[in-house]
Amino acid sequence: MADSDSYLKWAACLLADLPADWERELAVVRTPIVPSPLQIAAAVGEGPLPPVLSARSLRRTAQRTKPDVIVVACTGPVVDVLVAEVLDEVRPRPVFVTGLPGISVPATDKAWLFRSGCDLFVVHSEREVAEFGEVAGRLGGGGLLGLARLPFLRGPVPPGFEPDGRERDRVVFATQAKVPRAREEREQVLLALAKLAERRPDLDVVVKLRALDGERQTHNERHPYQRLWQDLGEPGRLRFAAGSMDEHLSLAAGFVTVSSTAALEAIDRDVPLLVLEDFGVSAEMINLVFAGSGLLGTLDDLADGVFRAPEQEWRAANYFHPAAASTWVSRLGELLGGERPPPRSLLDGPVHAAARRRARLRVEVPPEVLRLGYKTKRRLARVLR
């Protein structure tokens, strides 16, 4: 079960990696960040479209089907409340699997705390295993760690492949909701892309959007790129598009981002890329993992069309380990066949009860009703000042 666009893509790909004789079912949890039908279709690719279910419907489905495993592919507070409250009476108790849908370096205490009630936490590199192992040892609680290749990393397209007979002439900028945060920084990126488009008329320069105007995504975006471009007066030849990243990369001659996990998809598809360092390389910019990768560069590099390939040593330590090194399916088998007691959630108890109640509202109350309630609360607060 997934609650947002990025988690849905991760869940759909992860389920596809399970043994062929396992029965699988995918569902979307109805929350305020539920993906749109177009986002759902892009996330699951050619697979069947999953239903969007309320928490109550999810609970009834789990009680009826009695699954052996439930993959809780959701944002942290939703993982916690689903496992601790919504699904806690499903019997026999399933193995709860969780994880993060992309780059998780540096490992954070918060990510572990919210998921500490799950039996298996899936991570995607040797570095993440080490970092979350340190967090687990320090905080306690939680279940096992399992290593997996990021499930949407499938290898490069065959040499000479040209989808629909087209050449690779696209430069793809993968946007993110959280970084860079400042309006001025986002405008700088757009202007550098516009310079590239002006200097290289042979290239199709595309701003790849996570969500169209009005659609929700995992994190709220304060300054959407398309609106900024309109505010700037559209001073150049840029194209804005949503849809599947896989489709965009199949046509890409270059790729650029501040820190998107899609950079790993570009590496996987042998697309030259650039990770912008103009706004810093730090945990706050979510790009610390790219230090030492050989991929960091500047807005000037972008305007000049300079893209790079990663250092091989960095690649092996970060997300591109051999498939044989993955442990998550074997760890899952151990949990299914063993008598390991359920893990202890570090958020049980009165200290976190109020936060858990708020999370429960997000999964129980229809999003439009919840938004109306929040709006009414803000209005009352202004009146009562």
Question: Where does each model-flagged region fall?
Answer:
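C-terminal amphipathic helix plus adjacent low-complexity
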Residues: N287, L296, D300-R385
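Donor nucleotide-activated moiety binding/catalytic core segment of transferases
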Residues: T218-D268
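N-terminal pre-catalytic "stem/leader" segment of glycosyltransferase-like enzymes
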Residues: M1-V69, A381-R385
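Extended catalytic core of nucleotide-activated donor transferases of GT-like folds
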Residues: L38-R115
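Active-site-proximal region of nucleotide-activated glycan assembly enzymes
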Residues: V90-L147, L153-R154
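Structural loop-to-beta junction motif characteristic of Rossmann-like glycosyltransferase folds
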Residues: G254, D270-E277
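Short internal beta-strands
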Residues: E23-I33, V122-S125, V206-R210
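Conserved catalytic-core segment of nucleotide-activated headgroup transferases in glycan assembly
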Residues: W10, L153-Q226
